[in-house]
Amino acid sequence: MSEERKVVASREYVISLRRAYVVSRTKRAKYAVGLIRRFVARHLKVEPSAVKIGQKLNMELWSRGIEKPPRRVRVSVEKYSDGTALVELKE
């Protein structure tokens, strides 16, 4: 049986994605997802592979296509007791 996950920490961030515009146009949105994973992993002390991107955040990143992700996103992050983190778009 699996244990129930408990929220250990809950935070809000504004993550700048301007570094995604340094890479070639055809890789920007995918690179922006990686930027968010690395940012959250660094701030919450989890592995980048343990960071889950919410569906609404993913839709926002890809809304203008692969070539033009947003310059910044406001997110809410929850860290769970099992060492994972969930990143959702702040509304």
From Swiss-Prot:
One GO cellular component, as annotated: cytosolic large ribosomal subunit
CDD domains linked to this entry: Ribosomal_L31e (cd00463)
Family matches, as Pfam families: Ribosomal_L31e (PF01198)
Keyword annotations from UniProtKB, A to Z: Ribonucleoprotein, Ribosomal protein
Keyword Ribosomal protein: yes
Gene3D superfamilies reported for this sequence: 3.10.440.10
Protein name per Swiss-Prot or TrEMBL: Large ribosomal subunit protein eL31
Recorded GO MF terms: structural constituent of ribosome
Entries under InterPro entries matching the protein: Ribosomal_eL31, Ribosomal_eL31_CS, Ribosomal_eL31_dom_sf
SMART domains (alphabetical): Ribosomal_L31e (SM01380)
Domain of life: Archaea
GO biological process, one term: cytoplasmic translation
Family: Belongs to the eukaryotic ribosomal protein eL31 family.
